Amino acid sequence: MPNDATLPTAEAANPMRRATHNPLPRGNDADTLALEIVEKLTYSLGKTTGVARMYDWMDATCLAVRDRIIDHWISSTQKVNKDQSKRVCYLSMEFLIGRLLRDAINNLGLAEPVKQALARYGVELDLVELLEPDAALGNGGLGRLAACFMESMASTAFSYTHLRAHETRGNL
């Protein structure tokens, strides 16, 4: 892995972070992603690039990608509310979603920039993705159908809500 002294630090990603607590405008280029991943690594996980393990890189990458998903989520929710659009709500007792990091990166169009951002620190995106556990919620056909249904809606930028019933001691 490269020497910490030659790589951007979390302070470089956001020098006013402590003073303003305002998020950076999120760019989708490799430079911005690299800085934000390091910021997550430092301020969310308490690690430096020199001591971070592969799981730390996975967590930091997930957090940086999640921020972009939240930006899209807030924007689309505001648009749906403003336009008073209809919504699709899907209720499922089981839900086989699989691994989400690769899907999220692809749906945001960030596959190459994230790969380049991690490569700057000697980290391979393919190895990071393998660390994500499969959620394995549910046990079969309907769960897989729910996941496919939602994935197709996400890939086509269709606004939807997923509701999941939790059973506790026989009560929903």
Where are the regions that the model predicts?
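Conserved small/polar residues in nucleotide/adenosyl-binding loops
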Residues: 161-170
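Extended, charge-enriched "interface" segments that sit outside catalytic cores
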Residues: 2-83, 87-97, 101-108
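Flexible loop/turn segments at secondary-structure boundaries
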Residues: 97-100, 144, 169
